[in-house]
Amino acid sequence: RLDFETSGISLFCKSNEARQRIGDLLGANQEKREFLCLVHGSPQEETFEVDAKIGWVTGEPEIMVAGKRGKFASTKFEVVERLAGFTLLRCLPSTDRKHQIRAHLQHTGLPPVGDAYYGGSLLMLSRLKKNYRPRRDGTEKPLLDRAALHYAKLKFEHPFTGDAVEIECGLAKDMEVALKYLRKYATGIGAGPVD
């Protein structure tokens, strides 16, 4: 159920039986999932939780909204790093709803960078760097041209052996580059890694 823009872990099964068992396991929310998301703004708290129903936006089949209608969803968020005007968050969903993290972040006023569906704008170097000089043709490419959401870790019980399985995926290169430029040019009070 990953969005096509989300980088990171993709899980494939070798048989229909494995697919069915993994599907049952994931559907029962018995796995532990961890995402990293770069957002506009900064939460007041170091950790916070959003418990808000998620439902479809009328007339928009690809957009979900957090509010009073829809299915219950819960996501815990932890600050990983603060940068002036931006924050890298660890996202720990305990339910599995379409666009859950993105809708919950929009609901809290912290839209994901690059996520036009959920209120985020593209990350442009010209907005960060003083004395920025564009290319000769005057164009500028965004530092990140997708929603800044990365599937970093998945823990679950193997469907046949019962062994604990943990899969980790390092941050995608485009997000690493975006963070490099943010660390260099978007510094300020309260910026930096959180211990």
Residue ranges of model-derived segments:
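RNA pseudouridine synthases
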Residues: 1-195
